[in-house]
């Protein structure tokens, strides 16, 4: 039976394959792409470079680099991408998740001009975490965020950033796991986390909660420290950040002291 921690982080290849239905050939390619993504030794990726990279998307819903890798029948490419939610340029706390989910009536909400503008402005990197803003109260993302974070967070939306390994919405997280290692935009995000966020967390400058898929983020061998929490086992199934959770406790400690 796969190790509980590995099942959570994605570290057990057999478990990941059973969930995503990869063929043997796809499994080999998946592993190769994942290793390549984590061994990229090019220049450090900064938050400003992340914003610049995503600014090139213009009015499109899919980054040009990603188009060869995404299937429209697996991802909701009619929705705005969410590589991050919150001020990636200045956040005091970063939370790592897999990819944004999807419910059928989400499309109608995102056609509303005000919400569409908020979603597009999010890519500027200086906007508050939007899913808990009043404009999103009727959006399905609001319900998810409220259940995930619980109370006592709304006053800190300008200091929290949720990073998604895969920026595109899907109903099945298994599809995101399949493409994460090969998707160019995901490689950028992985590099940003490893180069910038992790280093700053170790220096005590930001908090880091690895809530989902630590192996796919290339962080499964990172040790927990004062400002770094890695969810394991049952923690990462729903990845709560409520006051009673380990991540939620760290988040509130950091936000309260700054």
Regions found by a protein language model. Give the residues of each.
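Active-site and ligand/interface coordination hotspots across diverse enzymes
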Residues: 1-132, 196, 220-228, 258
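Glycine/proline-rich loop-helix segments at beta-alpha junctions forming the active-site rim
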Residues: 2-34, 38, 42, 158, ...
């Amino acid at each position: 039976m796969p190790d509980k921690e590995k099942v959570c982080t994605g570290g057990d290849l057999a478990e990941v394959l059973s969930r995503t239905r990869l063929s043997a050939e796809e499994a080999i390619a998946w592993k190769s792409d994942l290793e390549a993504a984590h061994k990229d030794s090019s220049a450090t990726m900064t938050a400003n470079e992340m914003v610049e990279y995503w600014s090139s998307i213009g009015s499109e819903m899919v980054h040009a680099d990603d188009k060869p890798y995404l299937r429209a029948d697996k991802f909701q490419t009619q929705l705005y991408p969410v590589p991050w939610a919150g001020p990636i340029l200045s956040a005091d706390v970063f939370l790592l998740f897999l990819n944004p989910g999807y419910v059928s009536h989400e499309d109608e909400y995102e056609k509303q001009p005000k919400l569409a503008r908020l979603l597009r402005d999010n890519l500027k990197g200086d906007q508050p975490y939007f899913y808990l803003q009043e404009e999103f109260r009727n959006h399905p993302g609001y319900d998810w965020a409220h259940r995930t974070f619980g109370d006592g967070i709304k006053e800190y939306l300008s200091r929290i950033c949720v990073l998604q390994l895969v920026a595109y919405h899907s109903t099945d997280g298994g599809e995101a796991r399949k493409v994460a290692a090969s998707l160019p935009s995901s490689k950028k995000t992985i590099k940003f986390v490893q180069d910038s966020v992790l280093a700053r967390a170790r220096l005590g400058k930001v908090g880091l909660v690895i809530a989902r898929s630590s192996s796919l983020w290339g962080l499964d061998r990172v040790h927990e420290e004062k400002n770094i929490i890695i969810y394991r086992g049952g923690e990462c199934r729903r990845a709560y950040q409520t006051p009673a959770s380990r991540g939620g406790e760290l988040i509130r400690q950091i936000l309260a002291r700054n």
